[in-house]
Amino acid sequence: MRRSSGSRSTAILPLSTASRPARAGIWALEQAYLFKLLCVPPVAREGVLTNDARKTAANCCKRRRAFYIVDPDPSWNEPGDITADNGLNAFIAGVERENAALYFPRVRMADVVLGGAVEDFPPCGAVAGVIARTDDMGGVWKAPAGQDATIIGTQDLTVKLTDGENGPLNALGVNCLRVFPLIGPVVWGARTLDGADILASEWKYVPVRRLALFLEESLHRGTMWVVFEPNDAPLWAQIRLIVGTFMHNLFRQGAFQGATPREAYFVKCDEETTTQTDVDNGLVNIVIGFAPLKPAEFVIIKIQQVAGQLEA
């Protein structure tokens, strides 16, 4: 079943325990051309996914360069229920953390099935709407958090967090939903599950990771034409030109930090990235670096394509 959320298309699939070859449930996404966000709420409002289901969803996102929005355990009724030793680590054990983010608490909104009665719901769908709106208005590189990240359609939250409660959760990599006077419910955090202070990961922030995923997917698809081209210096120069143009357009849109293109990004594809051994194996390697808007050193991503194949 498909639903529309703003300008975005949303596919709704049952979470199935079927095997991957059956292409049922979440495995149906193997046939999807492209998706960017994944929500896997439990079947029942008060239900909870198994850890295996969370791991499957996160692994799916890693394979497809997508991002998984994780719901909190419904038993977490106050901030003190969420500590590294008190359930959080077990809750996300084995989950690929860099492509996922956890949001707390649950949201309160009208249940159309119950005639509009206000009930508690997992927040993943509401957060996905905020992220999609932020992508449309500011780009994938903009943090989907802050006063502009209002959660439309939500009446309230199950827990009203204070600044003092927000801080420790943020340090654990848990993104808080907050309620502010005159603003209402908002997303007030933009860290991945790899964003705990103790981890010091380069993928600490949601917009940095999602920008990298966007670049990887766009450049992988945008350079597939090289497969039947001679794998030599003219091809590498053409790749640098095309990828450089793509990166420059993003720079002009404000995707990167830096006053000049040199400060904002680089593209490398030459005899250093693609050795003679790579050429012999039919591979071309592209290295891209970019300066994210969050203060950090250049983030490096690598794209590998098959090249130099003679068309039969």
Feature-to-residue mapping (PLM):
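Structured, hydrophobic secondary-structure cores that serve as assembly/anchoring elements
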Residues: 24-312
